[in-house]
Amino acid sequence: MTHQIAVLPGDGIGPEIVEQAERVLKALDLPLELRQAPVGGAAFDQFEHPLPPATLELAQGSHAVLFGAVGDWKYDTLPREFRPEQAILGLRKALGLFANLRPAILYPELASASSLKPEIVSGLDILIIRELTGDIYFGTPRGVRTAADGAFAGEREGYDTMRYAESEVRRIARIGFESARKRNKKLCSVDKANVLETSQFWRDLVIEVSRDYPDVELSHMYVDNAAMQLVRNPRQFDVIVTGNLFGDILSDEAAMLTGSIGMLPSASLNAAGQGLYEPSHGSAPDIAGQGIANPLATILSAAMLLRYSLNLAPQADRVEAAVRKVLADGLRTADIHEAGTTKVSTSQMGDAVLKALG
């Protein structure tokens, strides 16, 4: 069976890093059909929309999507619906992507690159699972109005709605428990149940779902404490499951524990296992075209694609082992380079991973 992969390089460094991930996928000699399409600012320049119908159709008809990055300062003056970042939101909605998986792994060779002391972060391996479809990002009503009453009656006020449906919480909780079951059987649910009704609802439902997973140790933590504990003692965590807003913030915080966001892959999945795979970093237009971007997060995202959407765990293991090999050999792109290591370009890092694949 041939697996069709939609390849959407995007903007900034997106094309450079996606190119290296494509090379790795092709080197595995698998029945893959890689089909490219424009997205983000690159698509707007051609079609006056960040997510053209043909690109969306390709993504919907593919087994998985390999995504680079979108965004550039030159598009910041566009109406919001035409900005490059709307492409990723449109893809999440159209594909029904509800679970974002972001590993935060500190490779031993990069321990000194972390902003924390090695004795605190050594051995770090956290999986943060973020719900993508609900919460304050998508709740309605929202907008700007004149306050009708209260302490600020008559003033303009901005407002949003934080909401979660029961089915949304239950399905992301199950992803959390299933993931924890495959790892160290520890799941921490992060909320703000001491203040927010939405969070208390979340916590109650997670506890209900936990009864189906008696082998998984469930704990709860308020988001403010979780933010502190990620810096104070990050190794206490194995799998974290949380809502859209909290997950957005905590996953970026966890990323910096690893030394470089250029090392971190991510996967966004729907109920059928179809997924969008992208590096956790942005488009970095300031370094685009210079050949210095780190492609490893995108290559590791390709490994996640093999594992989660194509069920090709052995091939995913090979890619991840190849990345560990190049790091052990002392090869570094500019973002993770330090004294005693060898600085390489984007394409040279890709070459090294291909060589390590054998």
Curated annotation (Swiss-Prot):
Chain positions of site Important for catalysis: Y137, K192
GO CC list: cytosol
InterPro entries, per database record: IsoCit/isopropylmalate_DH_CS (IPR019818), IsoPropMal-DH-like_dom (IPR024084), Isopropylmalate_DH (IPR004429)
Catalytic function, reaction form: (2R,3S)-3-isopropylmalate + NAD(+) = 4-methyl-2-oxopentanoate + CO2 + NADH
Compartments, record wording: Cytoplasm
SUPFAM superfamilies (UniProt xref): Isocitrate/Isopropylmalate dehydrogenase-like
Cofactor(s) it depends on: Mg(2+); Mn(2+)
E.C. no: 1.1.1.85
Binding site for Mg(2+): D224, D248, D252
Origin: domain of life: Bacteria
Cofactor note: Binds 1 Mg(2+) or Mn(2+) ion per subunit.
GO biological process, one term: L-leucine biosynthetic process
Keywords: Amino-acid biosynthesis, Branched-chain amino acid biosynthesis, Cytoplasm, Leucine biosynthesis, Magnesium, Manganese, Metal-binding, NAD, Oxidoreductase
Pfam families in the cross-refs: Iso_dh
Gene Ontology MF, one: 3-isopropylmalate dehydrogenase activity
Its job: Catalyzes the oxidation of 3-carboxy-2-hydroxy-4-methylpentanoate (3-isopropylmalate) to 3-carboxy-4-methyl-2-oxopentanoate. The product decarboxylates to 4-methyl-2 oxopentanoate.
Subunit and interaction comment: Homodimer.
Protein name listed in UniProt: 3-isopropylmalate dehydrogenase
